[in-house]
Amino acid sequence: MSSYLFTSESVSEGHPDKIADQISDAVLDEILKQDPKARVACETYVKTGMALVGGEITTSAWVDIENLTRKVICDIGYEHSEMGFDGHSCAVLNAIGKQSADINQGVDRENPLDQGAGDQGIMFGYATNETDVLMPAAITYAHRLMEKQAEVRKSGKLAWLRPDAKSQVTLKYEDNKIVGVDAVVLSTQHSEEVSQKDLHEGVMEEIIKPVLPTEWLSKETKFFINPTGRFVIGGPMGDCGLTGRKIIVDTYGGAARHGGGAFSGKDPSKVDRSAAYAARYVAKNIVAAGLADRCEIQLSYAIGVADPTSIMVETFGTGKVANELLVSLVREFFDLRPYGLIKMLDLIQPIYRETAAYGHFGREQFPWEKVDRAEDLRIAAGLK
């Protein structure tokens, strides 16, 4: 019997890097509302007392960058100096330029279907049947812990909670099946006055226990709640934040490979983002069709070229049909040209700020989480 541990982490919406991601995607959303053909690559940097918004944007839209940035920061919960960061009074610097004309000529075409990829690169998508959302369990529950932290903070149930937090979940596997939670780490920013006893009890009873399956917890499960003992200084006062620095948190928690490209602040012409969403869509439909228990897709592109330069399917020995057949089915049922996948997944809409915390995958409200091709794939593969 093979036994092993696997761990994934998540961070809260108030983590400095996630503040930056949410600002970048809020800018993207506001632009897409006005200009569906915009080219956006928006980067944000946050540190004590300031937010710098920069990048390359070509659009006919007008967005009040300063007020939008302040709103995102305040919505997260950084509303007064007691938090160490205040959206009302921080400096907001704007360093946005236009997208290079050299890139434009490779992307834009008279026929939209000939639209070239905005850059070269490799993208991965993954799905597994170990959770109902066809995502790896460790990252799924790490995200849910962070969502619960925000919920009890914003509701006032645990009034001493502050926005910055991190979680980590270690699962124990036997013969590739989850048998329990080995360890949980949860660190959360808090107010000065709360005692360690109240903090530990509140986190355990209001965040951890309501989220993790009781059958996975045992007397052997280890809990590390604020293991340094103090986490008052947090957010951008504790660490600077930068767009695109939580790419493993954003995807599969290390359970699958990653092409290296970040998502937030990029419009759908950037295949770093849109093709990674399409790869998840393909992998999820293959698993939902029962063609594999686990599936990883790799796509690659060349700048200015429409068709993918490669498509790879890996099923880790769990496939019900040959991987070569799956590649053929992917080519038949999914249009993976940049414009094709944008249309297939309806990506020109202002949905991106919501993706920028708690993971881009495994959340059913997003169009790349649909399993509407599963039945067609199953029939075409010859499975009953």
Swiss-Prot record:
It comes from Haemophilus influenzae (strain 86-028NP). It holds the Pfam family S-AdoMet_synt_C. Keywords: ATP-binding, Cytoplasm, Magnesium, Metal-binding, Nucleotide-binding, One-carbon metabolism, Potassium, Transferase. Homotetramer; dimer of dimers. It catalyses: L-methionine + ATP + H2O = S-adenosyl-L-methionine + phosphate + diphosphate. This is S-adenosylmethionine synthase. The lineage of its organism: Bacteria, Pseudomonadati, Pseudomonadota, Gammaproteobacteria, Pasteurellales. It is an enzyme of class 2 (transferase). PANTHER family: S-ADENOSYLMETHIONINE SYNTHETASE. The keyword Protease does not apply. L-methionine binds at residues 56, 99, 239, 270. Gene3D superfamilies: 3.30.300.10. K(+) binds at residue 43. GO terms for biological process: one-carbon metabolic process; S-adenosylmethionine biosynthetic process. SUPFAM superfamilies: S-adenosylmethionine synthetase. Its EC number is 2.5.1.6. GO terms for cellular component: cytoplasm. ATP binds at residues 15, 164-166, 230-231, 239, 245-246, 262, 266. Mg(2+) binds at residue 17. GO terms for molecular function: ATP binding; magnesium ion binding; methionine adenosyltransferase activity. Binds 2 divalent ions per subunit. Binds 1 potassium ion per subunit. Pathway: Amino-acid biosynthesis; S-adenosyl-L-methionine biosynthesis; S-adenosyl-L-methionine from L-methionine: step 1/1. The gene is metK. It is found in: Cytoplasm.
